[in-house]
């Protein structure tokens, strides 16, 4: 609909807020007596159809299901193995600034240190007993923090990153009111994360890392 409005296809026909008069409707109907006008309107309308409407609706329904049924909480010991699997997911490693595979011992040491780290908040998201993803905050000096996100392979492509970010940011701000600035560092080629952070309200900042973009 938005695309049709931009090209002037639907403005005249489905403006529910307009105070219609019978004379207005007569004028619109009369326009369609002109074959050139009908051809022009047809071409405008068909130009915005890509055959993916059903796919978009399906994705939106799936996203709504997970948004309504997911639970968020701080990580605890039982999340060790689910997070280990997520950490070693191919795309997660590819989008990380440290791309090597993580051993279980290495992950275990990091995980238990994270649970004890008072400057780190690790939120996990589950649908029933299945891990959807995680959002992590690392609190730094000057009342700032760095945020990162990763989502499991089965939950990508539905637009869930925005939901996870918004939920985590809201809970983090409620608990850490002293934090005035939150930054995200994203690899330049990681378009999905870049788009998610922008939709969550982050903006481009100057970055001294040539391999990453900084959002704040």
Give residue ranges: language-model regions.
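Acidic/polar helix N-cap motif
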Residues: 21, 34, 76-79, 89, ...
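Hydrophobic alpha-helical core bundles mediating ligand binding, dimerization, or RNAP-core interactions
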Residues: 83-88, 107, 111
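A short helix-loop-beta-strand connector motif used in the catalytic cores of GNAT acetyltransferases and
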Residues: 112-124, 133
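Structural signal for short hydrophobic segments within the conserved structured cores
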Residues: 11-15, 73, 121-123
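Conserved GNAT-fold acetyl-CoA-binding loop/helix
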Residues: 91-109
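A generic secondary-structure signal
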Residues: 31, 113, 171-175
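Acyl-donor (CoA/ACP) binding surface of acyl/acetyltransferases
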Residues: 69-75, 80-82, 86-87, 128-216
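Nucleotide-activated sugar donor-binding and catalytic core shared by glycosyltransferases
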Residues: 1-66
């Amino acid at each position: 609909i938005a695309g049709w409005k931009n090209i002037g296809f639907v403005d005249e026909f489905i403006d529910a807020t307009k105070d219609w008069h019978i004379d207005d409707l007569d004028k619109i109907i009369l326009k369609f007596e002109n074959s050139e006008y009908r051809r022009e309107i047809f071409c405008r309308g068909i130009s915005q159809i890509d055959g993916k409407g059903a796919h978009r609706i399906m994705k939106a329904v799936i996203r709504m299901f997970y948004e309504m049924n997911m639970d968020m909480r701080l990580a605890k010991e039982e999340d060790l193995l689910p997070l280990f699997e997520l950490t070693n997911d191919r795309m997660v490693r590819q989008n990380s600034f440290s791309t090597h595979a993580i051993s279980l011992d290495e992950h275990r040491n990091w995980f238990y240190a994270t649970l004890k780290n008072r400057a780190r908040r690790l939120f996990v998201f589950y649908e029933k007993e299945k891990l959807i993803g995680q959002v992590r905050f690392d609190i730094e000096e000057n009342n700032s923090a760095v945020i990162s996100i990763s989502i499991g392979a089965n939950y990508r492509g539905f637009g869930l990153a925005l939901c996870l970010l918004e939920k985590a940011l809201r809970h983090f701000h409620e608990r850490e009111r002293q934090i005035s600035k939150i930054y995200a560092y994203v690899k330049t080629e990681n378009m999905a994360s870049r788009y998610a952070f922008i939709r969550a309200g982050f903006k481009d900042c100057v970055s001294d890392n040539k391999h990453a973009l900084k959002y704040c």
